[in-house]
Every structure is written in C-alpha cells, then in structure tokens.
C-alpha cells in the first residue's frame, strides 16, 4: 500500500501489503541503493508515521527522488546486456574495425526499431564512428526507453508498455491487471456493473521488473516473503543467484532445484509469483514448509528419466515428481506411466524398474502408510514369482501377468487386479503374504500392487 505521509523530509510510505507492492519495494530498494539515495526502512525507525498500516514493514522515501531520467539510467545499468546501443558503443571503442565488426554494428542497428529510425540513412562503414557515437549519446534516453519498454523479457513482459512512467491510470499497468480503455467496460465488474470493478495503479509498479529473477529465463520468479523489507530483498537476491548458478535445466526444474536448496533463507510457508513470456498474466503458487521439507528429502535421489511422448510433450520424471511434491499430489499416475513405459520398444527395463521402485517408496512415505514391510514383501514375491515361472519354463507369462495387473490398475479396477494376482498365486503355487493387506483396502494400498508388478521381470534364475 502506498501512503502519503508528512514525516520529517519524507512524503511517501510504501508497504508490502500484497505481492505487487512487495515487488515494487524490492525494485525501489535496488534503485535507491544504486544512486545512493537516502530512504528509511519502517521497522528500523523508532518514531513511526501517523498513518502506517500495522503488521507490515515498508520503506519511507521522497517521491521527488523518483525521476524518469534516473529511472532510465537505472534500467540501462540493470539490464545492460540487453541494451543494444551499449553493445554498439563497446564495439566503437576500437580504433580500427574488421569486416565482422562493421557487419555486427549494422546488424545491431537493424535489430531495434528505435535505432533503425535514428540511423535510417546512415550505414556504419568503419570511418564514421563519431556520427554513431554522437547520435546515440544525443538520443540515449529515447533509445533506453524504447528498448526497455518493448523488450519481451524486460518491461513489456510485466507491464503494459504504453503506460511506462505514467500516473493517474484508471487501471493497473501490470499484465493481467490491465484493461484496454477502448473496449466496452460494462462486463468488467460484478453483475456487469463497471462501477463494481476495482483497480489501483501507482508509478512505483514500474519497478516490479527489477524485483523478478533472472531476465535470461523465459519464466521468472518473485518470492513474496513480506515479513520484512530485509527478508524480501535478501531472499530474492539469494534466490536469483541460485537460479543463475543452476545450469542445464528448464525453468521449472531450476525452480524446483533451487527450492530444494533454499533452507538457508526459506524456512516458512511462502508465496511465489511467476511470470512467463508465453503468458499475458502472472501466476501464483503457495509453497508450504511441510511440502518444502518433502522436496528437500528428495535431494540426492536419482530421478533422471526423460521420454518423448509427442512433438509437444516430453515426460520429465524429475519435474513431474517435484511439481507433485510441492502441490501435495501423490505419485500414483506417475508410477503407472513408468510401469507402462517398461513395455515400450527399446526401453531400458532395468533402469525403468529401479526408478519405479524408488517412486513407490517415495509415494508410500508421502501417504504416511505404515506398509513398508509389506512393500518389501510384495517386491520379494514378485521376484520369486518371476524366478518360479522361469523354472516352470513359463517365462512368457511374466510379462503377460505384469501387463494384465498394470492394465487393471490403470483402469482403477481393483477387483480385477485382485483376481489376476490370485490367479498367478495359484498358478505358481505360492502364497503372497502382502495380498491380505491389499485385499482389505485395495485402493488405499495400491502401492503393494505397484511394487509386485514392478518386480515381475524376466530375470535369470541364476541372478538370485
């Protein structure tokens, strides 16, 4: 919440009452620190402003310290590697230019509309660098503003680019919160009443892009642990650094791995805001400490398995498990998928089996079921049954029974699964001790059937 105050020489208080104001606080702190501008943190001052909101920290500052000139200079520095004109100026520091450098300068000019407009009739030839340097310096603010506001991973990803550094807007500038003024507005509010539609917007929301992590990722994140300004700034700094140092993973997997290793700065329930370049809105998910602890318990477990399902979807076991862990969803469907993958052509059956067995153990621990002894029994029964079928010269029935059990489980037909397991027990002349627990409540104890089916594998009787 933004509040006008009369507090010594300061006139504005910004408190992180929701994620938008929290992100604005983080962005503003970076801005003030960059220029060495004085501001106060609410919890650090003994005498509080008269009209502050109790229960929230905040920052106290002078509104006059926020200027467009400084804002653009800050944006140029913060997102320096995306500022095309800076790349050009760096090249132009040379005294002599080779053909590749000349071509690169002209290609960089053509890559940005604002630069094409400024150099419409001029082409860099290696002898006219002074013209290029002076033109860029004379139009620097315009260049920065256009590059920044139109960058798909910069301002445009977070806000309506037409509203950059504007005030008194009727709707919020943020993506997903913004409304086209030229459209009919009668259907915006409750019962189609535009008067019931509420939106707020402040200039400080222009600092939100600086609060989100790693602009080189297609999906960026902001951790809204708004217990204090200190926790907001320090957590997001550490979070971004860990994301940067996590390599060779897609954005979601990076997030999961960072959360796994976040115990030094996240030790409580926390809200995380994400913004993807592929979506015109923000997404929020709530990470509960209980689930975060479960996620951290997965650290060190080998869940590497990737399989192409179709041109648009790759099954990533690690990602599937991590997302279900955070969302408090069990692994039943993932286990069934892995059991089915076992029968695919060219499947590395032993590898798939080991991953499936691990998933079953994780699933049982998440459920809190005290059936680990029965799980071990089911695995042992599966192995001994396979061995017995081989000895009976009936090894062809191993995969046959395995497929039948998996098909019944996929269809949630537990009566059919019981029949198949009983039939197999009679065929090999063995008693399956785990079966009685499965019989009592098949749906609750389906992991026993998962474990038994996974252990049915064509192994040599010598491999006992």
Where are these regions (language model features)?
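Long, contiguous all-alpha helical interaction modules
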Residues: 1-130, 134-141, 282-464
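Domain-exit/linker segments immediately C-terminal to small folded modules
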Residues: 178-331
């Amino acid at each position: 919440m933004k509040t006008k105050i009369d507090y010594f020489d300061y006139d504005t208080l910004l408190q992180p009452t929701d994620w938008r104001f929290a992100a604005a606080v983080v962005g503003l702190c970076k801005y003030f620190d960059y220029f060495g501008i004085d501001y106060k943190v609410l919890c650090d001052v003994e005498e509080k402003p008269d009209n502050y909101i109790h229960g929230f920290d905040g920052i106290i500052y002078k509104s006059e310290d926020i200027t467009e000139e400084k804002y653009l200079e800050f944006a140029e520095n913060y997102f320096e590697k995306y500022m095309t004109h800076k790349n050009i100026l760096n090249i132009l520091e040379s005294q002599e230019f080779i053909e590749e450098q000349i071509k690169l300068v002209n290609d960089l000019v053509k890559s940005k509309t604002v630069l094409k407009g400024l150099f419409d009739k001029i082409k860099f030839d290696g002898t006219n660098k002074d013209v290029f340097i002076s033109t860029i310096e004379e139009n620097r603010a315009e260049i920065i503003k256009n590059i920044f506001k139109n960058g798909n991973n910069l301002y445009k990803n977070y806000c309506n680019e037409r509203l950059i550094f504007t005030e008194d807007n009727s709707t919020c500038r943020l993506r997903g919160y913004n409304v086209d003024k030229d459209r009919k507005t009668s259907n915006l509010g409750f019962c189609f009443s535009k008067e019931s539609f509420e939106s707020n917007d402040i200039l400080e929301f222009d600092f939100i892009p600086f609060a989100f992590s790693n602009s080189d990722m297609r999906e960026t994140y902001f951790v809204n642990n708004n217990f204090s300004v200190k926790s907001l700034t320090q957590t997001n700094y550490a979070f971004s650094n860990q994301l940067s140092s996590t390599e060779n993973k897609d954005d979601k997997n990076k997030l999961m791995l960072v959360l796994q290793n976040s115990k030094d700065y996240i030790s409580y329930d926390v809200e995380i805001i994400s913004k993807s370049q592929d979506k015109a809105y923000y997404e929020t998910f709530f990470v509960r400490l209980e689930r975060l602890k479960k996620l951290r318990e997965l650290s060190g477990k080998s869940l590497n398995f990737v399989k192409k399902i179709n041109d648009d979807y790759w099954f990533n076991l690690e990602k599937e498990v991590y997302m279900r862990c955070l969302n408090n969803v069990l692994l039943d469907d993932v286990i069934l998928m892995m059991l089915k993958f076992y029968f695919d052509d060219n499947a590395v059956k032993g590898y798939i089996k080991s991953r499936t067995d691990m998933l079953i153990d994780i699933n049982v621990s998440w459920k809190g079921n005290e059936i680990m002894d029965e799980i071990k029994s089911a695995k042992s029964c599966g192995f001994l049954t396979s061995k017995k079928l081989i000895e009976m010269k009936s090894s062809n029935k191993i995969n046959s029974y395995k497929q039948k059990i998996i098909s019944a489980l996929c269809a949630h037909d537990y009566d059919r699964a019981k029949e198949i397991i009983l039939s197999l027990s009679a065929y090999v002349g063995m008693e399956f001790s785990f079966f009685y627990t499965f019989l009592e409540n098949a749906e609750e104890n389906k992991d026993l059937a998962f474990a038994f089916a996974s252990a049915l594998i064509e192994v040599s009787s010598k491999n006992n």
